[in-house]
């Protein structure tokens, strides 16, 4: 009996349909020119947790549940007296997703999390950085199914950066549209 290795839905869709659609749309001559997803970076600023390290731990735990891997605590580089901040205090958390976990997260983001956002009218299509990377923000981390609403102590916002190998914003937007990103413009 041959074991079938599990492959995420969006990864198999990319190989089967999206690569061909991108090659046809942009008339690439080489397979390696076709843009693909490189990584997804999740960043959660937890500046309110400076005074309470327990809040920082719950934020790290929530980000770990959302991402499926352990986040790195980002620390303050220098002290700022006005914010009661000391060098080395935890001020955020970040995690970088690659390979299968990246495709799994993207699938949950597009199919489950974004439709659960209050008053969601679509994503801003102008949030590209000029090099084919897309950045977006969420005001609440409660939209993810891994977070239990009853056990939440505080609502955190988060930044999501989708990095692609696309050379231009136009190519990156076409790639993300193929992945069913709901752009408004």
Swiss-Prot record:
Keyword tRNA-binding: yes
Coiled-coil stretches: none
InterPro entries referenced in this protein's UniProt entry, alphabetically: Ribosomal_uL5, Ribosomal_uL5_bac-type, Ribosomal_uL5_C, Ribosomal_uL5_CS, Ribosomal_uL5_dom_sf, Ribosomal_uL5_N
PROSITE patterns the record matches: RIBOSOMAL_L5 (PS00358)
Pfam family, one: Ribosomal_L5_C
Entry's Gene Ontology BP terms: translation
A GO molecular-function descriptor: structural constituent of ribosome
Keyword annotations: Ribonucleoprotein, Ribosomal protein, RNA-binding, rRNA-binding, tRNA-binding
SUPFAM superfamilies (UniProt xref): RL5-like
GO CC terms of this entry: ribonucleoprotein complex; ribosome
Quaternary state and interactors: Part of the 50S ribosomal subunit; part of the 5S rRNA/L5/L18/L25 subcomplex. Contacts the 5S rRNA and the P site tRNA. Forms a bridge to the 30S subunit in the 70S ribosome.
Function summary: This is one of the proteins that bind and probably mediate the attachment of the 5S RNA into the large ribosomal subunit, where it forms part of the central protuberance. In the 70S ribosome it contacts protein S13 of the 30S subunit (bridge B1b), connecting the 2 subunits; this bridge is implicated in subunit movement. Contacts the P site tRNA; the 5S rRNA and some of its associated proteins might help stabilize positioning of ribosome-bound tRNAs.
Family the UniProt entry places it in: Belongs to the universal ribosomal protein uL5 family.
PANTHER family hit by this protein: 60S RIBOSOMAL PROTEIN L11-RELATED (PTHR11994)
Protein name: Large ribosomal subunit protein uL5
Organism of derivation: Caulobacter sp. (strain K31)
């Amino acid at each position: 009996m041959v074991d079938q290795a599990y492959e995420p839905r969006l990864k198999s869709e990319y190989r089967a349909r999206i690569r061909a659609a991108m090659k046809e749309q942009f008339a690439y001559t080489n397979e390696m020119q076709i843009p693909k997803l490189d990584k997804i970076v999740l960043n959660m600023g937890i500046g309110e947790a400076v005074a309470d390290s327990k809040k920082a731990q719950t934020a790290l735990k929530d980000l770990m549940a959302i991402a499926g891997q352990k986040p790195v605590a980002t620390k303050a580089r220098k002290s700022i007296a006005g914010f009661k901040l000391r060098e080395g205090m935890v001020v955020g958390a970040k995690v970088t997703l690659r390979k299968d976990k990246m495709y799994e997260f993207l699938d949950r983001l597009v199919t489950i999390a974004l439709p659960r956002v209050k008053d969601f009218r679509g994503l801003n299509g102008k949030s590209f950085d000029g090099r084919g990377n897309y950045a977006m923000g969420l005001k609440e981390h409660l939209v993810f199914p891994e977070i239990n609403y009853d056990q939440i102590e505080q609502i955190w916002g988060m930044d999501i950066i989708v990095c692609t190998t696309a050379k231009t914003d136009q190519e990156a937007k076409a790639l993300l549209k193929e992945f069913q990103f709901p752009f408004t413009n």
